[in-house]
Swiss-Prot record:
Residues 107-120 have a biased composition (Basic residues). Located at the top of the head of the 30S subunit, it contacts several helices of the 16S rRNA. In the 70S ribosome it contacts the 23S rRNA (bridge B1a) and protein L5 of the 50S subunit (bridge B1b), connecting the 2 subunits; these bridges are implicated in subunit movement. Contacts the tRNAs in the A and P-sites. One of its GO terms (cellular component) is cytosol. HAMAP family: Ribosomal_uS13 (MF_01315). Belongs to the universal ribosomal protein uS13 family. This is Small ribosomal subunit protein uS13. InterPro entries: Rbsml_uS13_C (IPR027437), Ribosomal_uS13 (IPR001892), Ribosomal_uS13-like_H2TH (IPR010979), Ribosomal_uS13_bac-type (IPR019980), Ribosomal_uS13_CS (IPR018269). Coiled coil: none annotated. The gene is rpsM. It holds the Pfam family Ribosomal_S13. The keyword Membrane does not apply. Keywords: Ribonucleoprotein, Ribosomal protein, RNA-binding, rRNA-binding, tRNA-binding.
Amino acid sequence: MARIAGVDLPKKKRVEYALTYIYGIGLKSSQDILKAVNISFDKRVSDLSEDEVSSIAKKIQESYMVEGDLRKKVTMDIKSLMDLGSYRGLRHRKGLPVRGQTTKNNARTRKGKKKTVGSK
């Protein structure tokens, strides 16, 4: 099993789809990586040689921010928005939708379980 950026890639999948198991790499990025290192998209992970795996890993390391570093950057970006006191930061802090969605009826995913306010 090939291990790139701390992620075990599934053996039976095609390389272009297996690379998407790495956080921060989507289908387009994986295709760009494979083009850069001259590896066929149709190749399976189990058919990759050690040289090919190392060339993919090197390309990812020098060109992309993935896994822990990317997660840390996203978290720090959200934290900085909250520290600045921007509108987006306030919405993050309150656990409400950030991108302008209405909250009158929906937004249950962000708001959590319904809290019923009873009346007498």
